[in-house]
């Protein structure tokens, strides 16, 4: 890893280390713990960088630190409420933890600001399908509103 080489002088390159690029390569290689270290070093070079923070959240997710991932995504969204990637990541962590109602606004926010490139198509499709499942979207393409508490059955009617 570049930080190791920099620390012990392994590489003859005395230029600045690209910790972010290194982190991406490590994530691609499935080395999430090592990637997390690189992303943290990248964050020192660019404090508060939303892109780096989102990569940190993804690394947390992959190593099972989902609470930290949720906190990190929420931090990104405090700084940039339009951060589509943070909405996407947070939405699916919430769905996974059974907080589906809380995930819906994040799925909608992601879809409102979704990237349009070919690489994002699968993610956009997945978000649309999940939102449709959570909201009971009909074939019209319009999203049905969530029922109000008054429209829900009483607690004793559920059992």
Stretch-by-stretch model annotation:
Residues 12-49:
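Alpha-helical segment of the N-proximal tetratricopeptide repeat
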Residues 10, 41-44, 74-78, 109-112:
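Conserved structural position within tetratricopeptide repeats
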């Amino acid at each position: 890893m570049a930080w190791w080489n920099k620390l012990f002088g392994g590489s003859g390159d005395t230029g600045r280390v690209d910790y972010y690029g290194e982190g991406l390569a490590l994530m691609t290689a499935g080395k999430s713990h090592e990637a997390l270290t690189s992303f943290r070093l990248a964050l020192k070079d660019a404090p508060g960088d939303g892109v780096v923070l989102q990569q940190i959240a993804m690394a947390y997710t992959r190593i099972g630190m989902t609470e930290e991932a949720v906190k990190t995504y929420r931090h990104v969204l405090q700084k940039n409420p339009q951060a589509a990637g943070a909405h996407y990541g947070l939405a699916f962590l919430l769905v996974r933890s059974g907080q589906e109602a809380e995930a819906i606004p994040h799925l909608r926010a992601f879809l409102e600001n979704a990237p349009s490139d070919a690489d994002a198509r699968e993610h956009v499709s997945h978000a649309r399908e999940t939102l449709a499942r959570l909201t009971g979207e009909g074939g019209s393409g319009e999203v049905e509103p969530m029922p109000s508490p008054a429209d829900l059955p009483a607690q004793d009617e559920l059992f």
